[in-house]
Design a protein with these regions (language model features):
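Rossmann-like AdoMet
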Residues: 1-116, 121, 139, 274, ...
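Hydrophobic/aromatic-rich, well-ordered segments within soluble, folded domains that form packed cores
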Residues: 11-17, 127, 214-218
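Gly/Ser/Thr-rich loops at beta-strand to alpha-helix junctions
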Residues: 73-78, 132, 214-215
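A mobile, often basic/glycine-rich helix-loop segment
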Residues: 124-176, 222-230
Length: 333
């Protein structure tokens, strides 16, 4: 193999090295919050909503002792927020942060830091913007319509490689067929497998994946691979200096667990706007009369409404999809 050949890799391998290899983007001390805001960072209302969801799951399981497994935990911000929100609630929360980076200093000692979900958990497994960072290969249809792997250099240049084959070809044909020359897709099979593996660790409860996503009929014609650095969208270059991400085919992830691609008794796919609305986060403004009877309370409520509006906004975080999989004791490990 020549040095020139070694420079070119499929996007899955290149992303793995850039994000999680030595000196990789996600292993840096500043963590994801140093480069972009997720719903977790946008407002404590998000952690409050997850805390209410955790309470619902505990009630369904008939227990006050419940597991909360945060997959792709970043630096533990969501877990810290949920633990704070459940203080004094009577819930005994066993918190697990699943993350490939090292445990950050100062994290609540109640949080167990691990690189894989604990098996046999009973409670809520929550994965916010995790699946979009599971590395995947990119395919593009050549001039004859043949789907080929896209290879990338360390500088971000691309070329077409071998035809897509095997399980990847089957996934494309089922979930994201490429018919026109130049059409592109991210091959989501590794994400399906990652999600199914995470769900399989639950003995009972709910697994929830939250991400920017698409479903059959709304796939982007040229894929969605991009980069983020210091709060700005940048070209996807696998050099470790930026996040590399693409939207998730969440309907395929749903089917990987044996559920319907949307809906059904054990699987549900809804927008974040709808999911948070059910949990009391709506973005409605407080009544103006409150300003005269309780000015400080009105200001607080107005601020909270603004944060809720960001979490549920059309064209923004509110359009994220929530995939929920319910796991009964008979289904678990």
């Amino acid at each position: 193999m020549t040095d020139e050949t070694r420079r070119w890799r499929g996007w899955r391998e290149a992303t793995e090295r850039a994000l999680y290899g030595p000196g990789g983007f996600y292993l840096r001390p500043e963590g994801p919050a140093g480069h972009f805001r997720t719903s977790v960072h946008a407002s404590p209302l998000f952690a409050g909503a997850v805390a209410r969801l955790l309470g619902e799951v505990a009630e369904e399981l008939g227990t006050d002792g419940v597991d909360l497994v945060d997959v792709g935990a970043g630096r533990g911000e969501l877990l810290a927020g949920v633990l704070a929100a459940t203080a004094g609630s009577g819930l005994a929360v066993r918190a697990y942060a699943v993350e490939r980076a090292a445990r950050p200093d100062g994290l609540d000692p109640r949080v167990e830091w691990t690189d894989r979900p604990p098996r046999g958990a009973r409670g809520l497994l929550f994965a916010n913007e995790w699946l979009d960072n599971v590395p995947v290969d990119v395919a593009e249809a050549d001039a004859t319509g043949t789907a080929r792997y896209v290879e990338v250099s360390p500088e971000g240049a691309e070329r077409l490689g071998a035809p897509v084959s095997g399980a990847d070809a089957e996934w494309l044909e089922r979930w994201w067929p490429l018919r026109e020359p130049g059409a592109r897709a991210e091959i989501g099979r590794p994400r399906d497998e990652a999600w199914a593996a995470a769900v399989s660790c639950l003995a009972a409860g709910r697994a929830v994946a939250v991400d920017y996503a698409h479903v059959r009929g709304s796939r982007p014609p040229f894929g969605s691979l991009t980069g983020f650095r210091a709060g700005r969208e940048v070209p996807p270059v696998p050099d470790g200096s930026r996040d590399l991400t693409s939207h998730v085919a969440l309907d395929a992830c749903a089917a990987a667990c044996g559920g319907a691609s949307s809906g059904g008794a054990d699987t549900e796919l809804v927008t974040q706007r709808e999911a948070l609305g059910r949990l009391g986060v709506t973005g409605g403004r407080p009544p103006l009369a409150l300003a005269s009877t309780d000015p400080a309370g009105y200001v607080r409520a107005l601020s909270s409404a603004g944060e809720a509006a960001e979490l549920t906004a059309r064209g923004g975080l509110g359009d994220f999809l929530w995939l929920t999989r319910r796991v009964s004791p008979a289904d678990g490990p």
